[in-house]
Regions:
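Conserved beta-strand signature within the Rossmann-like core of class I S-adenosyl-L-methionine
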Residues: 113-127
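Conserved class I S-adenosyl-L-methionine
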Residues: 25-36
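Conserved S-adenosyl-L-methionine
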Residues: 158-167
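Core SAM-dependent methyltransferase catalytic element
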Residues: 168-185
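Conserved SAM-binding loop of SAM-dependent methyltransferases across substrates and taxa
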Residues: 37-48
Length: 185
């Protein structure tokens, strides 16, 4: 089933990282955390994912062509910390706002054979005084946030397979970064 009509900002964001990391979705079951309009979901399906479980705290955000795709199990108005996994998950995608990635990664750290392709938004890892109107304008602060995040990953048994800054900046100009992770066995 084609997903060509759903190339949103999210789609274009994950596209650069997935290509750079040579990430393989073929035949995999994917959990998309913070699915929003479905850009990450669409990309995963277009590149061979068997099924996507899309979890979104909001409602009515997923684009219509995706809402009716039988390969997608959409869970709207759902907090990821209340969500109960019923499927074996091969890949976790995450693009969340107003929330640190750390508690999400910690929550799923029992999934030892799962790959993680997640987007770090430094503005949501930052202290209030490190931002101006929600934007990190100081590159030194951004680099320190990234360094602290990577230290946290290592302390919590995550292995960084690859990482790169996003080709597209966030809507307000924040430079986001993708991580391809696995857990140490």
């Amino acid at each position: 089933m084609p997903t060509a009509n759903v190339k949103s900002r999210g789609y274009n964001k994950i596209k650069g990282a997935a290509k750079a990391f040579n990430f393989d979705f073929r035949g995999k079951t994917v959990l998309d955390i913070g699915s929003s309009t479905g850009g990450f979901t669409a990309y995963a399906l277009e590149h061979g994912a068997k099924k996507v479980i899309a979890v979104e705290k909001g409602t009515n955000q997923m684009l219509k062509p995706l809402r009716f795709d039988p390969r997608i199990k959409l869970h709207e108005k759902t907090d990821i910390f209340d969500f109960k996994l019923e499927d074996k998950i091969d890949v976790i995608l995450a693009d969340v706002s107003f929330l640190s990635l750390k508690p999400i990664l910690k929550h799923f750290s029992f999934l030892k054979n799962t790959e993680f392709l997640v987007m770090l938004k430094p503005q949501f890892e930052a202290k209030p005084e490190e931002k101006i109107n929600g934007i990190i304008k100081n590159e030194k602060i951004r680099r320190q946030i990234i360094k602290n995040f990577e230290y946290w990953l290592k302390q919590n048994n995550f292995i960084i397979i690859n990482k790169r800054d996003n080709d597209l900046k966030g809507k307000n100009g924040n430079q986001e970064r993708f991580y391809y992770l696995r857990l140490a066995k």
